[in-house]
Amino acid sequence: MNTTAPKLIISDIDGTFLNPHGRVTPRLRDVVGRAVRSGAQFGLATGRPHRWLLPVLDQLPFSPICVCANGAVVYEPGTDTVLRAFELTPEAMGDVIVAVEPLFADVAHGYSVERVGSSALTPEEECFLVTRDYNPDAWDSAYAVVTVEELIAVPAAKLLIRCPSMTSADMFELIAPVVDPADAHVTYSMNEGLIEFSHPGVNKATGVSVLAAHYGIEARDVVAFGDMPNDLEMLAWSGMGVAMANAASVVLDAADHVTASNAEDGVAVVLEHWF
């Protein structure tokens, strides 16, 4: 492990910064507070849209700038401002759907989009739109059901395809070879049959690099924590990429260091080495 303390700490949220109960533990909150008071910068990098950040930020004594939607949105919660957004065009989303639709002709599936919106308070049904067969999660309390044509009519931070009968890894193996990288970046952040598409070349590393530049910090002075394939580029870009013990195998293999699980305060274990 590096002996020099990082200047920027970046953590994924689900499966990493939060414990399995969705909480920031007192131990983790304390060490992050010590790091910030010592002069380090801190940020969260998540697949979540920025409107889903408040339950996490409410557990912290400060409101860090966050990288959201897998790097497509950089958001300042203190002023409720989108600092940067990388959006998929309607044309690109249409091309993606044309490419992947034949792969799922015989299984139930649906599409959704996450639009950026002007604020974290923008009504959810204006930002989260789904097709009839999408089958939203229980926590998706508000959404608009639209046609595919309406879904992709305006730019979006993310396009998603859901197939409940498959794992995300199996879907990824089918989808990745047929999607032109010039149309979209392909990844996933959960195991339950959900694939996420973003602007070409945009991933968490993109958003984190924007944040690092904002603070005048170079990649070698960044430590990043993650657990799922949508964290891979961020971990590779950072001077030190740390995987949680509960991480996907591909993430464990790619990381510079493996810490304890999110149930065992793995992020705090590493940060306490410096702070």
Regions found by a protein language model. Give the residues of each.
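Mg2+-dependent phosphoryl-transfer enzymes with acidic/Ser/Thr/Gly-rich catalytic loops
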Residues: T3-L8, T25, F197-F275
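Asp-based phosphoryl-transfer active-site loop
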Residues: A5-H21
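Active-site metal-binding loops of divalent metal-dependent hydrolases
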Residues: I13, G71, G226-M228
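Residue-level signal for inorganic ion chemistry
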Residues: G15, A35, N70, L159, ...
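Active-site phosphate-binding/coordination module
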Residues: R23-R132
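Hydrophobic packing residues within well-ordered alpha-helices of enzyme cores
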Residues: L28, L53-L57, M171, I175, ...
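Short active-site oxyanion
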Residues: S38-G43, F62-P64, K158, R220-V222, ...
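Conserved acidic, metal-coordinating active-site core of Asp-based
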Residues: L103, A108-F225, P229-N230
